[in-house]
């Protein structure tokens, strides 16, 4: 009887181990991605372009995601909206350097509500901007000291000689999607966002595109988080570079860099 009990116990332990392994294998990878990637990645996940089961997608400003990863957040893959925050994570030895790629590019645009009569153009000086803002309006911009879209916006406006004049009229947001929503909801008559954000939202129109030379290149690097370099995560990184994903990224207004 004792021998039978021991045998049953062994079978139960083995079965539990196999079940645990199967459950672990079924847990999808987690992507920490810049907020501007939400429409494109959501579409890919919905369509199965990123594998089955679809990965868990966590969106926020790149700065916030980088700090979470550095503090041990359970991310498998990180996609930043600029090189600065990927470099920061790398300095904290939190990514696998050999897996880092430049995945995407983007452009910076000035947006307004679709009914706006504003004729603001880049390079005309601040007067048309102030006229479009009116007495109490604000320019929606992501936080310029930490959020990539805000950093690029500050670089451009500084290069164009308008930062000092426009800064007091800015409504600064936690991420670029929040800046987009300020314009969508009519809370701001103007906003600076990525081209991909404008493509994703029919309730805004693009007034102008900032010259690429007015800011550092907009690059979205991707890398596997240290301790999460497994077959599933590598397959996910490969899926993001596949032709199917490339087509989705292009439709949402991104430039595809990775081959």
What are the residue ranges of the model-derived segments?
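Twin-arginine (Tat) signal peptide motif
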Residues: 1-9
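N-terminal twin-arginine translocation
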Residues: 2, 19-22
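Short N-terminal or domain-adjacent regulatory/targeting segments
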Residues: 2-3, 14, 117-121
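Bacterial N-terminal signal peptides
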Residues: 8-20
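Exported/periplasmic ABC-transporter solute-binding proteins
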Residues: 23-73, 82-83, 87-259
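Short active-site segment of divalent metal-dependent hydrolases/proteases
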Residues: 79
């Amino acid at each position: 009887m004792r021998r039978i009990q021991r045998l049953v116990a062994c079978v139960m332990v083995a079965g539990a181990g196999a079940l645990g392994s199967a459950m672990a294998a079924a847990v999808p990878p987690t992507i920490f991605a810049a907020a501007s990637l939400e429409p494109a990645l959501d579409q890919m996940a919905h369509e199965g372009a990123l594998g089955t089961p679809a990965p868990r997608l966590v969106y926020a400003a790149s700065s916030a995601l980088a700090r979470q990863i550095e503090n041990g957040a359970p991310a498998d893959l990180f996609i930043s909206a600029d090189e600065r925050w990927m470099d920061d994570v790398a300095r904290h030895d939190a990514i696998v350097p050999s897996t880092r790629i430049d995945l995407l590019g983007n452009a910076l645009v000035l947006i307004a509500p679709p009914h706006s009569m504003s004729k603001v153009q880049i390079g005309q000086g601040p007067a048309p901007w102030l006229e479009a803002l009116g007495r109490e309006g604000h320019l929606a911009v992501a936080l310029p000291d930490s959020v990539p879209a805000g950093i690029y916006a500050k670089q451009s406006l500084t290069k164009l000689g308008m930062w000092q004049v426009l800064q007091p009229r800015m409504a600064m947001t936690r991420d670029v999607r929040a800046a987009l929503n300020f314009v969508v909801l009519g809370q701001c008559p103007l906003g600076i966002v990525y081209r991909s954000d404008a493509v994703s939202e029919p309730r805004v129109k693009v007034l102008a595109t900032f010259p690429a030379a007015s800011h550092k290149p907009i690059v979205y690097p991707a890398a596997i988080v240290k301790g999460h370099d497994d077959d599933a995560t590598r397959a996910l990184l490969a899926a993001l570079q596949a032709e199917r994903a490339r087509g989705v990224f292009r439709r949402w207004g991104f430039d595809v860099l990775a081959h």
